């Protein structure tokens, strides 16, 4: 084959053209990770644009260490872009962020769930709205500072298709929060930090002379001042702070509480009752404002039913998970390693059987699915947990209690 018939070499982002002919929008939060992404792409010769979304402006949160996308962060992103010599734009997404992230977060707590607003933010504001803006600007890709990998996974029908994989730095793995990323979004997104350890990212930031090189990582829920989410929920949804009963699984009323928003499933400390036996929150009955408690074994869960499933396998979900199911690995908490599981789809819904079992699973949490337990495992998507099934005795007691009338 002659040289002129060879395909042009791929650049580092898997495009068949030179970096200087490839426009990339970088989502810049004002933190070290996205700043290093912009710096790396600039060094490699790409046509780089930095965009920062102003998502909220809640007083104390604006200057709180470890916040994201507020006043100080926007200024940090601007200064980084000045250092790198790239254009920087700020888009006001406060209204959109409130509608798609903050309000649903509060509503989820009122419903007795344990929501994950980072998933909603990635799903809507960052990977839907910002991605559309990047396309309007003529960009070939949207790059972010997330710790996750994507690689080409072409098919005859979709030559540009890509797949997601866990990152090299397992301690920084963000795949759990990205399970809802759609296939169309994955094909357009790029994650340059997926193969780097966090320590190397810090080193690169210092080498580039970036003002954010020693900046603290974002922590907890970015839009909540001082990390007190109950203040936000009470303000948006006053009914969440209404008093109710604390009830044992066996039906005994043990005391009262000042609002279900102060409790999470699996909680032991701070329940506010003393019975001489260790008790845990096993269910939040939002309809009747009851906090239901029981022994630790009542938290054990082996099956979770999912809603809003985002499937990223090569087959359709029905083809992969019908019959005997789809053997995979699942994470129901961001800090846990993926554990053996089987995904099923049948007339009762989409559900995951957890081989080992897990304690304290709450509605609203995510269940992310993987090909293997270790680093570099492929991400198959996942869903939000709609409900779970406990061990039989606890499940029967809970159903009987929920079916019983509540005293006026």
From Swiss-Prot:
Compartments, as annotated in UniProt: Cytoplasm
Any single GO CC term annotated in Swiss-Prot or TrEMBL for this entry: cytoplasm
GO function term, MF aspect, one: ATP binding
Gene3D superfamilies: Adenine nucleotide alpha hydrolases-like domains (2.30.30.280), HUPs (3.40.50.620), Translation factors (2.40.30.10)
Pfam families: tRNA_Me_trans, tRNA_Me_trans_C, tRNA_Me_trans_M
Broad class of where this protein is predominantly found: cytoplasm
Residues marked Interaction with tRNA (site): 146, 365
Catalytic activity: S-sulfanyl-L-cysteinyl-[protein] + uridine(34) in tRNA + AH2 + ATP = 2-thiouridine(34) in tRNA + L-cysteinyl-[protein] + A + AMP + diphosphate + H(+)
EC class name: transferase
Annotated stretches, region: Interaction with tRNA: 172-174
Active-site positions on this chain: 121, 222
Binding site for ATP: 27-34, 53, 145
GO BP of this protein: tRNA wobble position uridine thiolation
Entry EC no(s): 2.8.1.13
General function of this protein: Catalyzes the 2-thiolation of uridine at the wobble position (U34) of tRNA, leading to the formation of s(2)U34.
Name listed for the protein in its UniProt record: tRNA-specific 2-thiouridylase MnmA
């Amino acid at each position: 084959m002659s040289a002129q018939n060879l395909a042009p070499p791929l650049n580092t982002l898997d495009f068949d053209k030179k970096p200087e002919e490839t426009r990339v929008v970088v989502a810049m939060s004002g933190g070290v990770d996205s700043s290093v992404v912009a710096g790396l792409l600039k060094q490699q010769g790409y046509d780089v644009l930095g965009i920062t979304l102003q998502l909220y402006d809640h007083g104390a949160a604006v200057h709180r260490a470890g916040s994201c996308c507020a006043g100080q962060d926007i200024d940090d992103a601007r200064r980084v872009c000045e250092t790198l010599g790239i254009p920087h734009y700020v888009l006001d997404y406060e209204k959109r962020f409130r509608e798609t992230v903050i309000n649903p977060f509060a509503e989820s707590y009122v419903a007795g769930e344990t929501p994950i607003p980072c998933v909603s933010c990635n799903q809507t504001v960052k990977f839907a709205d910002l991605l559309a803006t990047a396309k309007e600007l003529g960009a070939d890709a949207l790059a972010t500072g997330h710790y996750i990998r994507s690689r080409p996974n072409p098919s005859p029908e979709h030559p540009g298709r890509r797949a997601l994989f866990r990152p090299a730095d397992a301690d920084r793995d963000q795949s759990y929060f990205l399970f809802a990323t759609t296939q169309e979004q994955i094909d357009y997104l790029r994650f340059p930090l997926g193969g780097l350890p966090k320590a190397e990212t810090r080193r690169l930031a210092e080498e580039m002379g970036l003002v954010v090189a020693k900046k603290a990582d974002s922590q907890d829920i970015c839009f909540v001042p001082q990390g007190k989410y109950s203040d936000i929920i009470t303000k948006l949804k006053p009914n969440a702070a209404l008093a109710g009963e604390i009830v044992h699984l066996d039906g005994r009323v043990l005391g009262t509480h000042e609002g279900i928003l102060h409790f999470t499933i699996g909680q032991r400390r701070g329940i506010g009752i003393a019975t001489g036996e260790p008790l845990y929150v096993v269910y939040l009955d939002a309809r009747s404002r009851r906090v239901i408690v029981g022994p630790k074994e009542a938290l054990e869960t082996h099956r979770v039913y999912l809603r809003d499933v985002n499937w990223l396998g090569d087959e359709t979900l029905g083809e992969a998970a019908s019959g005997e199911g789809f053997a995979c690995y699942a994470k129901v908490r961001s800090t846990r390693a993926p554990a053996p599981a089987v995904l099923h789809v049948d007339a009762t819904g989409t559900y995951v059987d957890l081989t080992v079992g897990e304690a304290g699973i709450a509605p609203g949490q995510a269940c992310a699915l993987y090909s293997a337990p270790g680093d570099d495992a492929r991400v198959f998507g996942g869903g939000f947990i709609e409900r779970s099934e406990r061990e039989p005795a606890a499940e029967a007691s809970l159903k009987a209690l929920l079916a019983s009338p509540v005293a006026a």
